[in-house]
Amino acid sequence: MAKELRFNSDARARLEQGVNALADAVKVTLGPKGRNAILEKLTGPPTITNDGVTIAREIQLRDPFANMGAQLVKEVAMKTNGVVGDGTTTATVLAQAMVREGLEAVDAGANPMRVRRGIERTVPVVVESLRSHSVEVGSSADLRRIAALAASDDEAIGDVIAAAVEHVGKSGVVTTEESDTLGMAVDVVDGIEFDHGYTSGYMVTDPERMEAVLDNPLILLTNKKISQVQEIMPTLEVAKRADRPLVVIAEDVDGPALQLLVGGNMHKTMRSVVVRAPGFGHRRVAELEDLAVALNGHVIAKDTGIELGEVTREHLGSCDRLTATENDTTIVGPHGLQNLVDARVAQLEAQRERARLDADRDILDLRIARLTGRVAVIRVGGATSVELKERMLRVEDALAATRAALEAGIVSGGGTALAQAHRALDTLELVGDEAIGRDVVRRALAEPLRWIAINAGFEGDDVVDVVADLPLGHGFNALTGEYGDMFEEGIIDPFKVTRAALESAASIAALLITTETAVVEEIVGQPGAIMAPGFGDLAEGMVRPSNIY
C-alpha cells in the first residue's frame, strides 16, 4: 500500500496537533475542581469520567499524522497507569509541556539530539530531589487524604479505602467489586477466599442465604476432571469413616460422580460440596498447591504422582469452616502448619521480585494475600450504571494512589513538589543545547500546578510565580484559594505516582522532538464507495496502525 510522508517542521507540527488535541481533552480534569468528560459508547449509555487514561483511550483523530501524536501521548498515560494506576493526567500535562517547549527550541535551531540528551540528564536529578523530600505515610489520616484527593476530593472514598488498607496492612490485598446496593462498603475476608462457588444448588445447606456451610470438612484438591464413581469413592470412604463432610475442589465434577454426591446431600447420608478449582491453565496447579499448604493436604495431579484411587486421609486437607456461595468460596481457620505457610509465602514473594509483567505481580500479590488471610473487598454501588462506572474509576484511582504512597512515601501535593523541584536544577551544569533540554524540563515542571489553578478559576501563571518563591512544601490550595503548608493541610501526593508521571512524560517527549520524518498509510477512496454527508468514504473507518489501543 502507498505511504504518505511529512518531513521536518511540517511533520513535527502535525504530530504536535495530535499531542495538543489529546492533552487538551484530558487536562481539564486535573485538580480538585477539575471537570468531567463524557464519552460516547457504541452500545449502552455514555461514560462520564475525570480519569485521564479512560479519556485518552477513547481518542482517535481523523488526521493520521495528528493521530500518531495523540497515540504517543496516550502511551504516556497508559504507561503511567500500568506502573502506578494513577497520575495519568499529570503525565499527559507534563508531556504536552515538554513537547511544546522542546519543539520550539528545535524549530529555533537547537540540535534535537542534544536537547533530548539534556532532558534525559535532567529528569533523574528532579526525581532524586523529589525522593529526598518524600516522607513515609505516618497515619491513617494521610491514607485518607491521599485516597480522597485521588478521587477528586471525595472524602467518602477516602474513608472507605483507608479502612480497607488499615485492616489488611501493607502486604494485604484490597480489591473492588460492583454492588447492587447504593453507596460503598468494605467486606473483610478472614481466611482464604477465591472466586469460584458450588457447582450444584442441591449442595446448599442454608436455602435462605443460598450458601453451603460445612464445619470441620475434609478437602480433596485436584486439577483433574472427575466423572466416574470409582474415582471419587476412595475419598468418600475416607470422609465417611471420619464422619466428616467432604469438599471436592477440582477442575470439574460431572456425570455419575456428581450424581452420587448430589444424592448423598439430598438423602442426608453424606454431606458434601463440589467447588471448581481457582485459577486457569498452568496457574491452576500453582494455586491448588497454595491451598494444599494452607489446608495441610496434597494436590492430586499427574505431576505429583498421586492418583484419585490412592487417596488416603493424609492426602486430604481440612479447616474449621468452609462457606460456598454460587460465586465464591471462603475457607476459615485452615489447618496448615504455620512454618510451611511462611515458607510458601517467602517463595511467592521471591517470585514476585523476579516477575516482569504487572499482571503476574498482581496475581502473586493476590496469592500471597490469600495465604496470609489479609483480603478486603470494597463494594461500590450507584443509582445508575453511569454513576456506578464513574465512581468505580475514581475508587480504582484512589486505591492505586494509596498503594503507591505506602510503597514509596509522599510529597507535597497540588503540583507543589514538581513546581518547586526546579531548585534542584540550579546546580546541574550543562552546556550548549543540553542546557536547553534542562530548561525544557524546568519550564514543564510548573505545568500541573498551573492547570490545577486554572481549573479552579485562578490565574495559573500568577499562582506558579508565588509558589516558586514559597518555602519548600508550601503551595497553593485550589479548594480554598489560599497558600500554606501542603502537609499540614493534607494536600499530598504519592512520590511513586509523581515520579512515574515525570519519567513517562519525559520518555515520550524526548523521542517526539527528535522526529524528522512521519510516515502513514495512504487511504484512497474506492470507486463506487458508499458516501454519507458529513461522514465521507467508508474507507475512513479503517483501523490505522497507530490506533493500537
From Swiss-Prot:
The keyword Chaperone applies. GO terms for biological process: protein refolding. It is found in: Cytoplasm. GO terms for molecular function: ATP binding; ATP-dependent protein folding chaperone. Keywords: Chaperone, Cytoplasm. It comes from the Bacteria. GO terms for cellular component: cytoplasm. Belongs to the chaperonin (HSP60) family. Plays an essential role in the productive folding of MimA and MimC, and thus in the formation of the active MimABCD complex. This is Chaperonin-like protein MimG. It comes from Mycolicibacterium goodii (Mycobacterium goodii).
